[in-house]
């Protein structure tokens, strides 16, 4: 087992990465201090892993309740969130009750938001079961739900007590979900570590096959990068925005297509290709770097051609973005591989990238 630390002073917490962790009650002991625990999971993950986590909590003498949510991005909304609140209230949960988020990014985001809101804040533990949530969304304290007009527009910063990433859970991931997680892995290399990006290029075939040793290394390095950024800028006042590389375009794709049509990682992957093209148009990265990002994204079985929403519709959707200021869209672009920055861009270049993004190159194919 590998343990990393998210250094946030009194709110610091560990990230445990390894195999066989769901059945390790001692990992939970320091982080579930009250008598009651509520596991929040979904219809897919619950039947696979909830009993194991429940047994660990009961081994610690805790009273445990399991809340099972519908599965999918389309359910990341108020009505689903209220299912968590209903369960907490009916169980008489108090401020020492610990919530345990057992699932992917949707479960983690909603459980964290419920923990931030219930009685103005109760503790929670992240137990991510998808690659995307293990390398990205479980770390950093961003919680929230979607609104029909924009992704993650309603939420709060609420740090978990711990993150427990059991690599064994990745074995049950469908190929599409695994690919979606690879988008965030690639992102971390692109924005912060060119050597890591090159390592992903060399090992992409084995990563696509979910090689456990390589997956553990990818989760570790991605968490190191994200934890380092979060420690410097917890509430996205500046540096943390670089973690949104590909997300301005990606969130527009998700909202424009309807939440759940594209997985978040699929939209981010395509968004990174678009952001790389825009970085190239503005003279920051060379043709080779743009091609490497596109080729690695495609090799990870992610879409590289954007849906045809219309240029004006894309721009309209991107204006509903947390980074936008006074209607001005901000993008995370690359100065070079391994170094990102936030900026506004000329309208003509943005429109050129959007026009190019929907075109299928004759030598490449869109990955469904």
UniProtKB/Swiss-Prot annotation:
NAD(+) binds at residues 71-76, 105-109, 129-130, 142, 151, 169-172. It comes from the Bacteria. It is found in: Cytoplasm. SUPFAM superfamilies: Dehydroquinate synthase-like. Gene3D superfamilies: 3.40.50.1970, Dehydroquinate synthase-like - alpha domain. It catalyses: 7-phospho-2-dehydro-3-deoxy-D-arabino-heptonate = 3-dehydroquinate + phosphate. GO terms for cellular component: cytoplasm. GO terms for biological process: amino acid biosynthetic process; aromatic amino acid family biosynthetic process; chorismate biosynthetic process. Its EC number is 4.2.3.4. InterPro entries: Dehydroquinate_synthase, DHQ_synth_AroB, DHQ_synth_fam, DHQS/DOIS_N, DHQS_C. Its main location: cytoplasm. Keywords: Amino-acid biosynthesis, Aromatic amino acid biosynthesis, Cobalt, Cytoplasm, Lyase, Metal-binding, NAD, Nucleotide-binding, Zinc. Pathway: Metabolic intermediate biosynthesis; chorismate biosynthesis; chorismate from D-erythrose 4-phosphate and phosphoenolpyruvate: step 2/7. Binds 1 divalent metal cation per subunit. Can use either Co(2+) or Zn(2+). Belongs to the sugar phosphate cyclases superfamily. Dehydroquinate synthase family. NCBIfam families: aroB. This is 3-dehydroquinate synthase.
């Amino acid at each position: 087992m590998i343990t990393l630390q998210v250094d946030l002073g009194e709110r610091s917490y560990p990230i445990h990465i390894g195999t066989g962790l769901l059945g390790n009650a001692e990992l939970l002991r320091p982080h579930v201090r009250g008598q009651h625990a509520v596991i929040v999971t979904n219809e897919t993950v619950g039947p696979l892993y909830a009993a194991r986590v429940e047994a660990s909590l009961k081994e610690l003498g805790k009273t445990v309740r399991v809340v099972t949510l519908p599965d999918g991005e389309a359910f990341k909304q108020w009505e689903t969130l209220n299912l968590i609140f209903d369960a907490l209230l009916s169980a008489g949960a108090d401020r020492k009750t610990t919530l345990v988020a057992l699932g992917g990014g949707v479960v983690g985001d909603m459980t964290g938001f419920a923990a931030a809101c219930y009685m103005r804040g109760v503790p929670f533990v992240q137990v991510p079961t998808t690659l995307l949530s293990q390398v990205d969304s479980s770390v950093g304290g961003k919680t929230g739900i979607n609104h029909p007009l924009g992704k993650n527009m309603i939420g709060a910063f609420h740090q978990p007590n711990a993150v427990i990433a059991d690599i064994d859970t990745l074995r049950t991931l469908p190929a599409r979900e695994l690919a979606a997680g690879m988008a965030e892995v690639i992102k971390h290399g692109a924005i912060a570590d060119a050597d890591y990006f090159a390592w992903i290029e060399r090992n992409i075939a084995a990563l696509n096959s979910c090689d456990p040793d390589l997956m553990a290394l990818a989760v570790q390095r991605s968490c190191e990068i994200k934890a380092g950024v979060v420690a410097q800028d917890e509430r996205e006042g500046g540096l943390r925005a670089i973690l949104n590389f590909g997300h301005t375009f990606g969130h527009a794709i998700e909202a424009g297509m309807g939440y759940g049509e594209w997985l978040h990682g699929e939209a981010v992957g395509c968004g990174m290709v678009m952001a790389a093209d825009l970085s190239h148009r503005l003279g920051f990265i060379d043709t080779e770097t743009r091609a490497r990002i596109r080729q690695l994204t495609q090799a990870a079985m992610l879409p590289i051609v954007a849906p045809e929403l219309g240029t004006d519709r894309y721009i309209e959707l991107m204006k509903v973005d947390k980074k936008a200021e006074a209607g001005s869209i901000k993008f995370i672009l690359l100065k070079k591989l391994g170094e990102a920055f936030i900026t506004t861009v000329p309208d003509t270049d943005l429109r050129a990238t959007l026009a190019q993004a929907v075109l299928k190159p004759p030598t490449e194919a869109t990955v469904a």
